[in-house]
């Protein structure tokens, strides 16, 4: 039997009827689902009107097919009298996930869901966890920046963390197709906007906290609080646990906050003071990475992986700790870590035909990520390291000069180009980046056309040299103005090397 509006009002007392058309009765109004995208609504849906859309509320409400409108009680908007209006005291987006979960029969309740948050490393860590669990027979799902993956399906959602309605629908699909374990990225946007509300989580994993998204968050404290929110919403009925990198930026502070506010939540901390899990003796090459991980009982294990870069020492160690919490076999994990499938756009190497030169494509688009990838590439001792990067338009502008300083200090030469300029003028973005260079420093090339910049960068690369192409990684598009064009760093590098 289809859900009725009266069932919803009973389940969520915070919802109040703002208006009910004459002749309508909550007992007879069918409710199919809830959506915050007016384009996805059907007549029996609820259109959730987020506060974040501001002055466009009226426009979206007039375009929706939904018969029920949910909005903040302070909204002063004229609504067609044929619509049913529901009101609430909080931002409706914060309720959306719980309502979506209720309407779908709480699909996440029977799933083992691990959410990973942090400025950098979310995509790599969730992909590593997916591989480890799958190798041990678990039927897994993956949700994140690269898309959604389960069974033979691969879906591009366009978001690191999909909106709450889409997320619950994805989880229901996964559950219906036999998935038992899900690894998902939890972005700070998703956490602050309530996209994970109503999701029953088994574990939360924290990688690090460095500057990003200050165009969205008021300051770093607000950014941190959004990350902490993940651990507050873990499902206590699932014996939840937390995993964090104590030595990473923000790790110490998060550990302390969890201890003070969530004293019953078990924590597995990497490199914590007095902790049982510590990393030592990392050895990095272009063939792979190895390190020693200390374990409880004065034991240790050398871990080897095909993944490259110092950051993957942290990622694989955190994945191992998370796997322990999920009951995965340690020996099986040690074996699986040796051959993790290439994560698209993460330290992805492309060699020239004769392998005398190489390019590294990486998603690094924050100061910390750029520094980490340049240092990791440096470990391969290229004869010359040229770093090519830009910064996204309509995003945090304060990181632009910082990334310039990092590129100048750690690279032999620098090429400036466009990332996703969006509504900003590409040359203006490059001006702001270039303001971070020291007096007298001039980039090797300044070219807003990213394809041309990559081609010229490869063209001047000497034998034994490396071109680091940073910022877009796996992305297969470039946003210029309002237009989303096909574009792939990997494709452009391969073209420049004459590989196709």
Swiss-Prot record:
Subcellular location: Cytoplasm
Binding annotation for meso-2,6-diaminopimelate: 395, 419-422, 471, 475
Reaction equation(s) it catalyzes: UDP-N-acetyl-alpha-D-muramoyl-L-alanyl-D-glutamate + meso-2,6-diaminopimelate + ATP = UDP-N-acetyl-alpha-D-muramoyl-L-alanyl-gamma-D-glutamyl-meso-2,6-diaminopimelate + ADP + phosphate + H(+)
Residues annotated to bind ATP: 118-124
InterPro entries to which the protein is assigned, alphabetical: Mur-like_cat_sf (IPR036565), Mur_ligase_C (IPR004101), Mur_ligase_C_dom_sf (IPR036615), Mur_ligase_cen (IPR013221), UDP-N-AcMur-Glu-dNH2Pim_ligase (IPR005761)
Keyword line: ATP-binding, Cell cycle, Cell division, Cell shape, Cell wall biogenesis/degradation, Cytoplasm, Ligase, Magnesium, Nucleotide-binding, Peptidoglycan synthesis
EC assignment: 6.3.2.13
Pathway: Cell wall biogenesis; peptidoglycan biosynthesis
Gene Ontology terms describing biological process: cell division; cell wall organization; peptidoglycan biosynthetic process; regulation of cell shape
Co-factor requirement: Mg(2+)
Modifications the protein undergoes after translation, according to the UniProt entry: Carboxylation is probably crucial for Mg(2+) binding and, consequently, for the gamma-phosphate positioning of ATP.
A UniProt-annotated Pfam family: Mur_ligase_M
PANTHER family, alphabetized: MUR LIGASE FAMILY MEMBER, UDP-N-ACETYLMURAMOYL-L-ALANYL-D-GLUTAMATE--2,6-DIAMINOPIMELATE LIGASE MURE HOMOLOG, CHLOROPLASTIC
NCBIfam families documented for this protein: murE, PRK00139.1-4
Protein name (database record): UDP-N-acetylmuramoyl-L-alanyl-D-glutamate--2,6-diaminopimelate ligase
Species in which this protein is naturally found: Leptospira borgpetersenii serovar Hardjo-bovis (strain JB197)
